[in-house]
Amino acid sequence: MISRRTAILSILAVGGVLSDPLPTLSQTKRADPFLGLDTDNDGTLDLDEAQKAAAALFDRLDINHDGTLDRHEVGSRLSAREFAAADVDKEGTLTKDEYLAIVEQRFKVADTDKEGTLMAKELQTKAGRALVRLLK
């Protein structure tokens, strides 16, 4: 028969091994900026992949399905100033073309080596994180 002390120590020992928490989904996303973006699995993000992700996000954010995003739908992805600058036609909303133009601008800023693709280290910069906010 196992003593109560032995049973408790066994539970604590197993608990100690198992107590290292698994990463949460948000931690995984932070650790892997490419999660779901690098569709050709080449380890980089190109402008086409970025624009496809941005277009898909645009469609998800367009809650009222009017083909544009207002400040509420964009949320914190853009500051009020950035939103106003991107709103070329000054209608108070962003069309998909206006949204994708911002994505292209941010992609070019994040592409510090000007190779036309973004590596993980480029996505972890301030400019890279600003781009990722428009993609996820």
Locate the predicted segments by residue.
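N-terminal export leaders
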Residues: 4-8
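EF-hand and EF-hand-like Ca2+-sensor regions
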Residues: 60, 78-85, 99-136
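EF-hand Ca2+-binding helix-loop-helix modules
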Residues: 25-36, 41-60, 75-82, 100-106
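Bacterial N-terminal signal peptides
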Residues: 10-17
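Blade-edge motifs of beta-propeller repeat domains
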Residues: 68-70, 91-97
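C-terminal segment of classical bacterial N-terminal signal peptides
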Residues: 17-23
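Acidic carboxylate motifs that coordinate Ca2+ or other divalent cations, activating on Asp/Glu
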Residues: 42, 62-66, 89-91, 111-115
